[in-house]
């Protein structure tokens, strides 16, 4: 083979190799683009101007499809969906009040989320799609959305907890304009059983609520700290050493080194050290839902002069050592240590002790027992009772109301 023939052969080989490589890359690129850029043809949910909402699911081989959502004021509702000739199932939910709604489909007996709706929340192990209905600025739906207002920042922060002997994660909201120069008050916002440091930011829409309240001048700019209330866990499922385990109330079996109440001062010290806070009682508030309301109640007795504002949302008030199978009412009437701690709380004169609960909440009896005892010993509090039960819809309302009462 002469030099000319060799060069032509080599060039031909290189050209073929380049062509095959280019075709392979084009194929891979097309595949990657399909995953990134393809848009589902099915629009779901479609929120109409009157607040009605159309939900759709393409399932041509399905026999029965229904949707279940919290479309009623205080309860979930299951609606049948209708199939067209192309196998597209749909239903239009009648006009809804301003609110954030959750829903999921049921296809031939199998619960599934809406593939046309990328917005999904996790509540313990349950995944649900969400959508928001708003009719005018300032209504509940508006307050749960991101609007054209100044936005605060949301950070996931790791802190050291000497009491629990672990490094733990929490979510911290800093208001728009926070620059490390001005000092701000702090609201500690606690989740319920099965939740974690993500719960209030995701299910509770805490950042959106605070952004909108502050922008409207209804709430003072404040830092909001959302810790993980499970003292035997470092962080939310998938965010620490055990890895991608299935979330659950008692999935992690290891015993905590201390209680949430006993370890809470670790959080306060970290926040006061790392943020520009008003590091005194007048600059601190605390509230929580369900278990977090119980933690708030316990901390108010354990540290009565650390916080000036307390909020119990559908709270589960209890006394660790005193309960032992007893009803709350009996403990309040007979346990002298509990009585002394409530007296100390009363005498500390907090600016606000706020209790909110739904009329059908299973913890209503316990909250009534606590209020009755407070009345008997002259412990001041504000009480709010509304429709509904132990649901996020109520807890978002309570946060909205409580935040407007703080630091004024």
What is each PLM-predicted segment?
Residues 47-77, 82-408:
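Non-catalytic cap/lid and distal C-terminal segments of serine-dependent acyl enzymes
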Residues 32-33:
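Boundary of Sec targeting at the N-terminus
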Residues 27-29:
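N-terminal signal peptide c-region/cleavage motif recognized by signal peptidases
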Residues 39-41, 77:
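Non-catalytic C-terminal accessory modules of carbohydrate-active enzymes
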């Amino acid at each position: 083979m002469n030099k000319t023939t060799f060069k032509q052969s080599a060039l031909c080989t290189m050209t073929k190799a380049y062509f095959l490589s280019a075709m392979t890359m084009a194929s891979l690129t097309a595949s990657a683009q399909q995953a990134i850029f393809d848009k589902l043809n099915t629009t779901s949910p479609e929120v109409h101007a009157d607040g009605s909402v159309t939900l759709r699911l393409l399932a041509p081989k399905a026999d029965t499809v229904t949707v279940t959502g919290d479309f009623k004021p205080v309860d979930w509702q299951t609606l049948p969906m209708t199939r067209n000739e192309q196998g597209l199932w749909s239903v239009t939910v009648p006009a809804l009040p301003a609110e954030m709604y959750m829903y999921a489909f049921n296809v031939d007996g199998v619960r599934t989320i809406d593939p046309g709706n990328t917005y999904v929340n996790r509540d313990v192990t349950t995944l649900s799609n969400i959508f928001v209905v708003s009719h005018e600025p300032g209504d509940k739906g508006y307050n749960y959305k991101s609007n054209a207002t100044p936005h605060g920042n949301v950070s996931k922060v790791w802190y050291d907890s000497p009491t629990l002997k672990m490094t733990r994660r929490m979510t911290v909201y800093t208001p728009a304009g926070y620059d490390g120069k001005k000092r701000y008050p702090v609201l500690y916002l606690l989740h319920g059983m099965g939740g974690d440091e993500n719960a209030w930011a995701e299910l509770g829409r805490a950042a959106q609520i605070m952004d909108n309240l502050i922008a409207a001048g209804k709430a003072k700019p404040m830092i909001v700290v959302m810790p993980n209330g499970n003292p035997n866990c470092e962080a939310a499922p998938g965010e620490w050493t055990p890895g991608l385990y299935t979330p659950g109330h008692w999935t992690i079996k290891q015993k905590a080194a201390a209680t949430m109440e006993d370890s809470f001062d670790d959080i306060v010290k970290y926040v006061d050290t790392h943020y520009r806070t008003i590091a005194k009682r007048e600059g601190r508030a605390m509230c929580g839902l369900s278990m977090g309301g119980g933690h708030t109640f316990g901390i108010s007795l354990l540290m009565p002069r650390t916080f000036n504002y307390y909020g119990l949302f559908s709270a589960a008030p209890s006394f660790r050592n005193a309960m032992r199978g007893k009803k709350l009412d009996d403990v309040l009437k007979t346990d002298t240590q509990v009585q002394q701690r409530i007296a100390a709380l009363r005498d500390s004169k907090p600016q606000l002790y706020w209790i909110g609960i739904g009329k059908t909440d299973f913890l209503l009896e316990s909250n009534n027992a606590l209020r009755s005892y407070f009345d008997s010993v002259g412990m001041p509090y504000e009480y709010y009772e509304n429709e509904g039960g132990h649901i996020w819809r109520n807890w978002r309302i309570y946060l909205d109301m409580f935040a407007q009462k703080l630091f004024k």
